């Protein structure tokens, strides 16, 4: 697929067909692609956790997500939970933040990788 077409056809999915299942291999491919996203000073602070079991999916959906997002993931066959290692991206080796954004750099990088 041509890159411009990929960009133009990108969508935020908010309704899932419970009959359609994503395979573990497809999930691995998505996470592998995200890992190649650039990060602040190549700090690579993104972490990915995949929720495949229905019991854990429901627990995360009902106990961890805001109501709007909990409703949006109904019917999805998996959740990919993303997190960032704190106090690394946006920080110098001395442990001091590079600027006022501090941990914001890691969150920013994670958002870009998730796209």
Where are these regions (language model features)?
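Short alpha-helical segments used as structural interaction elements across diverse proteins
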Residues: 7-8, 38, 58
């Amino acid at each position: 697929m041509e890159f411009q077409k990929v960009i133009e056809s990108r969508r935020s999915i908010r309704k899932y067909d419970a009959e359609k299942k994503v395979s573990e291999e497809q999930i691995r491919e998505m996470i592998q692609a995200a890992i190649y996203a650039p990060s602040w000073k190549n700090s690579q602070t993104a972490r990915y956790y995949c929720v495949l079991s229905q019991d854990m999916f429901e627990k995360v959906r009902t106990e961890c997500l805001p109501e709007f997002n909990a409703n949006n993931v109904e019917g999805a066959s998996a959740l990919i939970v993303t997190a960032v290692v704190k106090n690394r991206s946006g920080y110098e080796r001395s442990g001091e933040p590079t600027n006022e954004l501090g941990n914001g750099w890691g969150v920013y990088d994670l958002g870009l990788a998730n796209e």
